[in-house]
Regions:
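A near-ubiquitous, low-amplitude feature marking generic local secondary-structure context
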Residues: 24, 74, 106, 110, ...
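Generic secondary-structure signature for well-ordered alpha-helical cores
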Residues: 42, 46, 140, 144, ...
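Short terminal or interdomain "cap/linker" segment that borders an active site or interface and mediates
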Residues: 146-219
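Internal, well-folded beta-alpha domain core
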Residues: 113-171
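Active-site helix-to-loop segments that bind/position phosphate- or nucleotide-bearing substrates
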Residues: 1-116
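Short cysteine/histidine-rich zinc-coordinating motifs and their immediately flanking basic loops
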Residues: 219-228
Length: 228
């Protein structure tokens, strides 16, 4: 299993990325908001983020995915995306405890306004998204040098969130310090789990198979260059 620390700066998060997470989409906010975002990004610039990743053999069935002998009840939509995969990267990534601590300090500061707190939360969401992309790039560069899917996670498109537990168990139970609640929510909150299949027939993101077409956080696929 590969467990790594990733400096915040390596994620190359921009003010535009955070504005997108807030809901501005392709439009930028006014200069005052951009300055606030920029200042808060500096608050988090020294934190360390983390991921753990392992590769397992597996197979895809019509409504489920089997990884290292463990069956995930992914449902038809996710299984269809992963058709053709014989190996799976399973990962958990997190913004980490340092991020949570700084957010708590911001919330407890009586001078902090609600917008600043909202932006700080959006920065955490952006960290999680960027870590997912970082893991995919790591796979592309060094581990699985061929075509593979984007990451998909329990909770996507009728895949029961309870499958978080067996996913975490594949990575030792509490990978990179992330733990699950009884309701299968992750803590630290700004964390991401997922699977990535090799040799898939199509490359889509979770948003591509989600029926919530009017979600303000919806994104189109961002494909990595295929390697053959």
């Amino acid at each position: 299993m590969e467990c790594r620390t990733v400096p915040f700066t390596a994620l190359e998060i921009t003010s535009a990325d955070v504005a997108d997470a807030i809901g501005y989409g392709p439009h930028l906010p006014d200069e005052n908001v951009l300055q606030l975002i920029s200042g808060l990004l500096c608050t988090f610039e020294n934190i360390q983020t983390h991921y753990c990743l392992d590769i397992f053999d597996g197979m895809v069935h019509s409504k489920s995915i089997e990884i290292n002998g463990v069956t995930f009840n992914s449902g038809t939509a996710v299984a269809n995306v992963m058709q053709g995969a014989k190996q799976f990267a399973v990962f958990v990534a997190t913004a980490g405890e340092e991020y949570e601590r700084l957010c708590a300090e911001l919330t407890s500061n009586k001078d902090a306004d609600i917008l600043s707190q909202y932006i700080a939360d959006a920065i955490g969401s952006t960290i999680a998204v960027k870590l997912g992309a970082y893991v995919e790039k790591r796979l592309a560069d060094a581990i699985i040098p061929q075509r593979f899917s984007h990451h998909l996670s329990p909770g996507y498109c009728h895949w029961p969130v309870s499958d978080q537990r067996p996913l975490f168990d594949l990575l030792g139970g509490n990978p990179c310090g992330v733990r699950l609640s009884d309701g299968f929510l992750m803590y630290p909150v700004k964390s991401l789990s997922g699977i990535i299949g090799d040799q898939v027939r199509q490359e889509v993101s979770g948003c591509d198979i989600c029926p919530m077409v009017r979600c303000f956080r919806r994104h189109a696929s961002t494909k990595l260059p295929n390697k053959t």
